[in-house]
Amino acid sequence: MSENLSEKKKALEVALSNIEKRFGKGAVMPLKSVEKVQVETIPTGSLALDIATGVGGIPKGRITEIFGVESSGKTTLALHVIAEAQKRGGVAVFIDAEHALDPKYAKKLGVDVENLYISQPDYGEQALEIAESLINSGAVDVIVVDSVAALVPKDELEGEMGEAQVGKQARLMSQALRKLKGAVHKSNTALIFINQIREKIGVMFGNPETTPGGRALKFFSDMRLEVRRLGDVKEGGEKKGYRVKVRVVKNKLAPPFQEAEFDIIYGEGICKLCDLIEVATNLGIFTKSGSWYSYGDKRLGQGKEQVKKYLQEHPELIDEIDQKVREAAGLAGSNIEESTGEEGK
């Protein structure tokens, strides 16, 4: 019996080795494997989400889909990724197919709008050809396409109202992604598609939710992030933002199905200090007794707001705590700005 199991194990190892040679590392791996594919990443702006991805953020040289219902925080998350890439000296491009980007809001999130390249294409083919040219240049670190639903084929725009256009967008996406996949890998560009959730008509069993653009994007994406709005964030009875849950529904680089929750504050974006406090508490770096938080021998305050104020007054602690959190989670680098102002919130 043991000899039979040993032979099976050897046969499996040979098969996995051959698969890895043909399709790359991470094509098949144990679900609970601690080992992760080593890849360069861009932080998401949320420490909890960086940990949930298993690799520290949005992978470069790969395709990522961020999808969710309207006003769930998809574009906010993508803009935070752009801001993090720019902080590290990277070049970022925003392909605004929806023609809806607000530069003032982007600036509040930390985006260097003066050095952000933006394109507002007239139709889907133009948007994807622009993306392909930029990727092939090898000079761009991250490209965000907002959104797949707005990538309308030229034929559809030039056709008559009410004319059947079944499957044209799906074919467009399928053709484009076959070309883009290899180019993205060679250029080490992070390509992010923002997508919406729609409901299938007449579905009585199973999940009625779907995303526009056909199945190609689901197939070619190395990482898919589902963004859900949980509820309002209130302070003194006043709504100041909303709580978001992001689920990693597909991950070729680390075990999938991890989740992260964080707050998005109106006009400010992701509350990075709130995120840091929650993650540090969950990992045992902060201790909590009742509503009091402590860090080692230091008493930080009663309630999150007092802890935030304490950290803003002692910015040197932010980076120290951030590093400890990342080490405890198996990540490296820093994602929190040392700031005593609004950006540190």
Swiss-Prot record:
Give the family this protein belongs to, as stated in its UniProt record.
Answer: Belongs to the RecA family.
Pfam families per UniProt: RecA, RecA_C
PANTHER family the UniProt entry points to:
MITOCHONDRIAL DNA REPAIR PROTEIN RECA HOMOLOG-RELATED (PTHR45900:SF1), RECA (PTHR45900)
Arranged from A to Z, the UniProt key words for this protein are: ATP-binding, Cytoplasm, DNA damage, DNA recombination, DNA repair, DNA-binding, Nucleotide-binding, SOS response
Broad class of where this protein is predominantly found: cytoplasm
* The protein's name in its UniProt record: Protein RecA
GO CC term (a single one): cytoplasm
- Tell me the domain of life: Bacteria
Signal peptide positions on this chain:
none
Query: According to its UniProt record, where is this protein located?
Result: Cytoplasm
UniProt organism field: Aquifex aeolicus (strain VF5)
MF terms per GO, please? ATP binding; ATP hydrolysis activity; ATP-dependent DNA damage sensor activity; damaged DNA binding; single-stranded DNA binding
What are the binding positions for ATP in this chain? G68, V69, E70, S71, S72, G73, K74, T75
